[in-house]
Amino acid sequence: MSLERVLKTLEGFGLSRIDAEVYVYLAKKGPKKGRELANALQVTKQQLYPSLKNLKNKGIVTANLERPALFSAVDFEKVLELLIEIKVEQAKVIKETKKELLGSWQSIS
């Protein structure tokens, strides 16, 4: 699988392009500090840190408690499972919304 295909797949699961690039870089290169990541990915720290926060909130990236923090990627297979689980939950919500909308539709005179 090519890098571009991996990035596009992660985007399809709801990650932004920068989130996908940050995750893949950490997964392939190992734990890095924010400054190292920003330099390697040629992004500003102002672009990087919201992405890292988003990835941490999704359970895709972890950070230690040191200063400066060292960021690590969660195993790719586990990330795929997490992202698939999110999509399955979203599909359930959509199905429930469909039922509610159909009920509302039928009650409209």
Map each language-model feature to its residues:
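Short capping segments at the starts of secondary-structure elements
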Residues: 27-33
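Amphipathic alpha-helical dimerization/coiled-coil segments
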Residues: 81-109
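Pre-recognition alpha-helix immediately N-terminal to the DNA-recognition helix
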Residues: 21-25
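Alpha-helical DNA-recognition elements
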Residues: 54-57
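Key DNA-contact positions within bacterial/archaeal DNA-binding proteins
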Residues: 20, 45-46
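Residues within the DNA-recognition helix of helix-turn-helix
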Residues: 51
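A short acidic, leucine-rich amphipathic alpha-helix
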Residues: 36-41
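Short, cationic-aromatic polyanion-contact patches
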Residues: 5-19, 33, 62-86
